[in-house]
Amino acid sequence: MKVTRKRAQRERRHRRVRRKIFGTPERPRLSVYRSNVHTYAQLIDDIAGHTLAAADSREVGEAESRVEAARKVGELIASRAREAGIERAVFDRGGYKYHGRVAALAEGARAGGLKF
């Protein structure tokens, strides 16, 4: 029961944040999803409803920790964004706290050249 409530609270926070955040083709939404093991990131154009670029921790290979893997995912999504001609994005933390893996992904994306 507790897990269900925790997930519902995260989804509620995500809906609240999503009311304010919207991605466009010029400035897509950088959406973050965190599972127990992996971290996923997508650049989404909400107008067309398309994913412009995606990356996840399964692609980055071995990492010392999940936080380090998330940082590498951020760098990978930033490089894919540059390839797609995207320089700026809107960060969507997905209802998660801006801490740990979510913050590491954001820092990695910024280090890779993505601005938000």
UniProtKB/Swiss-Prot annotation:
Keywords: Ribonucleoprotein, Ribosomal protein, RNA-binding, rRNA-binding. GO terms for biological process: translation. GO terms for molecular function: 5S rRNA binding; structural constituent of ribosome. The keyword Ribonucleoprotein applies. Signal peptide: none annotated. InterPro entries: Ribosomal_uL18_bac-type (IPR004389), Ribosomal_uL18_bac/euk (IPR005484). One of its GO terms (cellular component) is cytosolic large ribosomal subunit. Transmembrane segments: none annotated. Part of the 50S ribosomal subunit; part of the 5S rRNA/L5/L18/L25 subcomplex. Contacts the 5S and 23S rRNAs. This is one of the proteins that bind and probably mediate the attachment of the 5S RNA into the large ribosomal subunit, where it forms part of the central protuberance. Belongs to the universal ribosomal protein uL18 family. NCBIfam families: L18_bact (TIGR00060). This is Large ribosomal subunit protein uL18. The gene is rplR.
